[in-house]
């Protein structure tokens, strides 16, 4: 405190889990109302030891990218599958193929995740669906990786749908950018934490986390 010549503002960010809180505060004039040169953020991590501190230079949390895949096929009676195109079969092939993006299309040194979280149809017990909607969540720790995931996803959906003679579309939207720590400020925060907690309680090079914060 005695060596600090400045002002500290405490920012309590709303809606960080939905990745809109910081954007809203900035749009409402946070940095025009207050003369802020640097921002340091803290987040609890349940699997870290109580009283410990971790950070890293560069990317520390991933971008969050929500996607929606729609398949428009030709439904029909379950007893007459040859009279239509089973959208579930098409969607299932897409869901499995999407997992090859991370395992076969990304550099193994890169971090990425593709998860299908919903698979919705308009079928019934004895009716093959004509429409399938899949939604999901993709994470990446670089812009290049994110763009690769998006382009490969589109190629997979269009290719499989074309093979079955149906229409498919992808809506891929980045809802939260990745968090990238500045080098100098990260060093300052780590040194301060070591003074407070001790070197054995501080890790200045933790593994990046693929959850997302804004």
What residue ranges belong to the model's regions?
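Histidine/acidic-residue-rich, glycine-tolerant segments that coordinate divalent metal ions
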Residues: 2-118, 123-127, 212-213
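Metal-dependent amide/peptide-bond hydrolase catalytic core
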Residues: 89-214
């Amino acid at each position: 405190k005695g060596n600090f010549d400045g002002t500290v503002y405490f920012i309590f960010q709303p809606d960080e889990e939905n990745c809109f809180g910081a954007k809203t505060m900035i749009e409402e004039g946070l940095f025009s109302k207050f003369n802020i040169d640097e921002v340091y953020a803290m987040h609890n991590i349940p699997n870290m030891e109580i009283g410990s501190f971790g950070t890293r230079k560069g990317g520390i949390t991933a971008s969050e990218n929500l996607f929606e895949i729609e398949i428009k096929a030709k439904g029909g009676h379950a007893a007459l599958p040859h009279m239509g195109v089973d959208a579930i079969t098409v969607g299932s092939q897409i869901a499995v193929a999407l997992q090859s993006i991370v395992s076969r299309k990304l550099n193994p040194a890169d971090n990425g995740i593709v998860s299908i979280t919903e698979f919705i149809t308009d079928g019934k017990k004895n009716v093959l669906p004509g429409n399938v909607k899949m939604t999901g969540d993709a994470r990446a720790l670089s812009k290049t990786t994110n763009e690769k995931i998006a382009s490969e996803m589109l190629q997979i959906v269009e290719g499989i749908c074309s093979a079955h003679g149906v229409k498919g579309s992808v809506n891929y939207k980045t809802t939260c950018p990745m968090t990238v720590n500045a080098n100098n400020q990260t060093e300052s925060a780590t040194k301060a934490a070591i003074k407070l907690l001790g070197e054995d309680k501080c890790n200045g090079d933790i593994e990046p986390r693929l959850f997302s914060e804004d």
